[in-house]
């Protein structure tokens, strides 16, 4: 299992458009991947799950992966979040 914390940099957080990019990136990996906010954990490959967390700008989340490509998965998703989804 591999875990990293990241702060969502874009002002509006993970609304529909950036959440879609996040899920698309997560689905590139074989590992099981989760996003956790304040002890609530959801499947990072589920749009409804990610949106249900209500992640706004400035929120710190955990990206968690377990599987063969767990480090690559977490690092790629953290980089995407840190980029601000180019918004």
Predicted feature locations:
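Conserved beta-strand core positions
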Residues: 4, 33, 59-61
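Compact, glycine-rich, soluble single-domain proteins
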Residues: 9-48, 52-57, 87
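Short amphipathic
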Residues: 1-10
């Amino acid at each position: 299992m591999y875990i990293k914390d990241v702060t969502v940099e874009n002002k509006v957080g993970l609304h529909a458009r950036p959440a879609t990019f996040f899920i698309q990136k997560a689905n590139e990996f074989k590992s099981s991947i989760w996003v956790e906010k304040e002890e609530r954990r959801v499947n990072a490959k589920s749009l409804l799950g990610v949106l249900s967390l209500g992640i706004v700008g400035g929120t710190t989340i955990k990206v968690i992966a377990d599987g063969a490509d767990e480090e690559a998965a977490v690092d790629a998703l953290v980089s995407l979040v840190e980029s601000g989804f180019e918004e």
